[in-house]
A protein has these predicted regions:
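Short amphipathic alpha-helical interaction segments
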Residues: 35-46
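Short, cationic-aromatic polyanion-contact patches
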Residues: 2-10, 23, 57-68
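Short amphipathic alpha-helical interface segments
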Residues: 6-32
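Short amphipathic alpha-helical segments enriched in leucine
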Residues: 18, 45-48
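Short loop/turn and capping residues at structural boundaries
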Residues: 28, 41, 58-59
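A short, conserved structural fragment
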Residues: 48-58
């Protein structure tokens, strides 16, 4: 996967988070944006490395939230 594609996918996730924070379930983001696991993971890693997102979880589900 090219770095440009990872950055593009990170941008799609970021736009979704800016638009709608009502459901930030990682699996739902994956489905809505039609990404495979590799695409989602690398894009989330990109955003985390830039300190733009944080991860929270309950017992079964991971969520992504923008860093304030």
């Amino acid at each position: 996967m090219k770095k440009e594609q990872i950055g593009f996918n990170a941008g799609k996730i970021w736009q979704k988070l800016e638009k709608d924070l009502t459901d930030t379930n990682v699996n739902k983001i994956k489905r809505e944006l039609k990404m495979n696991s590799m695409e989602l993971g690398t894009a989330l890693g990109w955003l985390a490395r830039e300190n733009k997102i944080t991860f929270v979880s309950d017992e079964k589900t991971f969520y992504v939230l923008p860093v304030e």
